[in-house]
């Protein structure tokens, strides 16, 4: 990779927005995507330095449960995807969106309705 290519990478660009600016943008938005609304998405904290976000979800029983009264796995994957995509946006200083090309998930416990917390962190950019 040339030096000029490295300089244009979003993760190396000095942030134009503060962490609080980004958080306030998310909290003030009136056009939250329908999927985010369905999942009960709420951004709790942002760290551009750590390339991470903390997110809350409210898993409503009347919407997200399977016949076993547990959160359907596809909804849990969507929650994870939200954490990943918002972390990528934050890592880029809100200049890039990273679509999910591939995602592998292993479930170790069932998800139950109510409040859930997720953390997204960019480990490697590019």
Model regions: which residues?
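Terminal targeting signals and extreme-terminal segments of soluble enzymes
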Residues: 1-126
